[in-house]
Amino acid sequence: MEDEEKAVEILGNTEAAHPPSPIRCCWLRLRCLAATSIICGCSCLGVMALVFAIKAEERHKAGRSEEAVRWGARARKLILASFAVWLAVLILGPLLLWLLSYAIAQAE
């Protein structure tokens, strides 16, 4: 009985000494998404997202997880903005051309 109590105490101490670090982002996936946003999205926002993703990965490797999460969040926002801008251009471009042709046809 004493052995079991000691084992439980030792396990409790090791868990308290090394709390599991929360994994909030896959850093490699974030970098790949940033590179994809350069190619498939608005490239200027994608480049900034890639820079922020690399900074987040470096901070994570250095053990500064709070800064890594902050830089990762910025990178994610820029990745989403890059894709949103590109989708808006893809949708609004043809729509505006259609409206322009309609307006010209009505003017004649």
UniProtKB/Swiss-Prot annotation:
Subcellular locations according to the entry: Membrane
According to its record, how does it sit in the membrane? Multi-pass membrane protein
Name any GO cellular component annotation. Answer: membrane
What is any Pfam family matched here? CD225
The answer to whether the entry has keyword Flavoprotein is no
Which keywords does UniProt give here? Membrane, Transmembrane, Transmembrane helix
Record-annotated membrane-spanning stretches: 34-54, 78-98
Its domain of life reads: Eukaryota
What family classification does the UniProt entry report for this protein? Answer: Belongs to the CD225/Dispanin family.
The protein's name? Transmembrane protein 265
